[in-house]
């Protein structure tokens, strides 16, 4: 009987040791290191804008030349591009913009339509604004304008002005780089003159590609304005007849450009 008890005790001790070894030697299911690769991060996926359809230019029933692009889609695209680079959205929903109704705002040279304007701080007039001109029914974008107050033409506001304009263009041409835009902006500014207060300002030159016209308007006492506007052949002809230089295609940072001066075949 004593031998039986000794053998039973030895067996229990062996089982306890074996169980303890198993418990200490391998992590539990709750702490076990993952054996599969982590999910693929979003940054390794194609950018969202690769699935975007090109934006066409159309004319609505009221005869307004516009992009086939709603304000909501513009905001979604703009914020997608901005947040990919800066980690947050820039533009609020349209109902948080200042609504000036139908007109041309106080800006000469702009389109007549339903006017909206936004700044991150509405009381800071040194901050460059972004404006949307929509069709009078408010459902399609006609033009986008970035504006810079001439009284605050210093490095900070000017940089933000150009950056807001860049992302406006990227809504239509997502692959446009900052270096490309700097090349474009330099060429828009070259030999540009400020119109007198009583004159209707005209751009020195217009760059045009796939229905999108981009140009700079300068006038004494007004905001410096970079326009991204829906355009067609009739508008290009009108500009050219007024002496405006039309350049087909946007320049790139490597010095190339699509199209030639005066070539505005659509």
Question: What are the roles of these predicted feature ranges?
Answer:
Residues 25-27:
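Bacterial signal peptide processing site
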Residues 126-193:
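Long, charged/polar, surface-exposed segments that mediate recognition or autoinhibition
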Residues 2-11:
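Bacterial N-terminal signal peptides that target proteins for export
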Residues 20-23:
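C-terminal motif of bacterial Sec signal peptides marking the signal peptidase cleavage site
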Residues 45-59, 121-142:
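Compositionally biased P/S/T/G-rich terminal and signal peptide-adjacent segments
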Residues 33-92, 252-254, 259:
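N-terminal low-complexity, Pro/Thr/Ser-rich intrinsically disordered segments
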Residues 167, 171-266:
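Non-cytosolic coordination micro-motifs
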Residues 88-131, 178-219:
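A cross-family detector of function-defining hotspots
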